[in-house]
Amino acid sequence: MAAVSLSVSTVKPLGDRVFVKVSASEKRPRRLYFPDTAKEKPQVGEVVALGAGKRNDDGSRQELEVKVGDLLLYSKYAGTDVKLGTEEYVLLSEKDILAMVG
């Protein structure tokens, strides 16, 4: 089996999934209040890659509401955590996104 080298540019989310770079707590927007319990696991991140969108019953794609570069607030235990080098990412379904920030 050949070794696969993962980087942000090689990760292509499928369907309605969104690949998000997790923001360090000190980079969080100051205008948002996060209770102490939310500081355990970051819930804010920047979109770095998108899937093509959810497939509808008729075969067409439903466009995602977010775009690369958007800052998001997402569910605390949502998605799959991915570490590439020293950076942390999370692969989310669009339904796990709570809000766009900024």
UniProtKB/Swiss-Prot annotation:
Protein's GO biological process: chaperone cofactor-dependent protein refolding
Entry's localization field: Cytoplasm
Record has Chaperone as a keyword: yes
Keywords, alphabetical: Chaperone, Cytoplasm
UniProt cross-references to CDD domains, sorted A to Z: cpn10 (cd00320)
Keyword Ribosomal protein: no
One of the record's GO cellular component terms: cytoplasm
GO molecular function: ATP binding; metal ion binding; protein folding chaperone; protein-folding chaperone binding; unfolded protein binding
InterPro entries: Chaperonin_GroES, Chaperonin_GroES_sf, GroES-like_sf
Known role: Together with the chaperonin GroEL, plays an essential role in assisting protein folding. The GroEL-GroES system forms a nano-cage that allows encapsulation of the non-native substrate proteins and provides a physical environment optimized to promote and accelerate protein folding. GroES binds to the apical surface of the GroEL ring, thereby capping the opening of the GroEL channel.
Family designation: Belongs to the GroES chaperonin family.
Subunit text: Heptamer of 7 subunits arranged in a ring. Interacts with the chaperonin GroEL.
UniProt protein name: Co-chaperonin GroES
Organism, as annotated: Anabaena sp. (strain L31)
